[in-house]
Design a protein with these regions (language model features):
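Beta-strand-turn-beta hairpins that frame and shape the catalytic cleft
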Residues: 1-4, 120-130
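N-terminal active-site segment of His-dependent metallophosphoesterases
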Residues: 1-84, 91-98, 163, 167-170
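Short amphipathic alpha-helices and their capping/turn segments at secondary-structure boundaries
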Residues: 14-22, 70-76, 115-124, 183-194
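Short catalytic/ligand-binding loop motif for oxyanion handling, primarily in non-cytosolic enzymes
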Residues: 36-37, 92-94, 123-128, 136-139
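Proline-centered loop/turn at the N-terminus of a beta-strand
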Residues: 81-83, 114, 127, 195
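Glycine/small-residue-rich loop that forms an oxyanion/phosphate-binding "nest" at active or ligand-binding sites
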Residues: 97-116
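Active-site-proximal loop/helix segment associated with metal-binding centers of metalloenzymes
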Residues: 129-194
């Protein structure tokens, strides 16, 4: 099985064309591909004509969403299987759990694109397991968690929709890391006799 891995495309800034000249069976989109919130925000119902710069903002979001969807169509057409794993940037300007839902809804439109967020996909007897792994914050070290919250954009622009939309915290990220890592270890153990 041939696997092609790409990440950090940041389609919110410009388009990117991925070809399959290698004849890969699986394309893995390994995070920081797009912003999930844009898939939700571009709807006309969200448009406020009285806000400053609203038309330009709506137009930019619509262009980004069109770019995201064209990218997915091209990937779906060129590769027999596409695995999508969200990175931290997918959650920017949005809500953590809702962002996962927006991406699942979008990916479900393509029969050969699979999102792995504490999920497993078996392709030709090969087990793929994945999820956004985040970080354990140096084993939840309080000094690390305090310092990192002041330094990284993630903790200013990602909201935790299970905590009254408060900003994501270092503890939120460490908890999610532990859950995802636990899931991956469980699946690896369950499928230890497989590829």
């Amino acid at each position: 099985m041939k696997i092609k891995l790409v990440s950090d495309l940041h389609l919110e800034f410009s388009d990117c064309f991925i070809n399959n000249n290698e004849g890969a069976d699986v394309l893995i989109l390994g995070g920081d591909i797009m912003i999930a919130q844009d898939l939700h925000d571009h709807h006309a119902a969200d448009f406020n004509p009285y806000s400053n710069g609203a038309l330009a903002d709506l137009s930019r979001k619509m262009q980004r969403v069109a770019r995201f969807r064209d990218f997915f169509k091209r990937c779906s057409f060129q590769f027999p299987h596409v695995i999508y794993i969200m990175g931290n940037h997918e959650f920017y300007n949005g809500k953590f759990y809702a962002g996962i839902d927006y991406m699942r809804e979008e990916v479900a439109k393509y029969p050969n694109i699979y999102m792995l967020e504490q999920d497993t996909k078996i392709i030709d007897d090969v087990v793929f397991v994945g999820g956004t792994l985040w970080t354990n914050m140096n084993k939840r070290d309080p000094l690390t968690m305090h310092a990192i919250e002041g330094m990284m954009n993630d903790f200013r622009i990602i909201r935790n929709d299970k905590r009254n939309y408060a900003a994501m915290s270092a503890l939120d990220v460490a908890i999610r890391h532990d859950k995802t890592l636990g899931y991956i270890k469980l699946i690896v153990e369950e499928h230890k006799d497989k590829k």
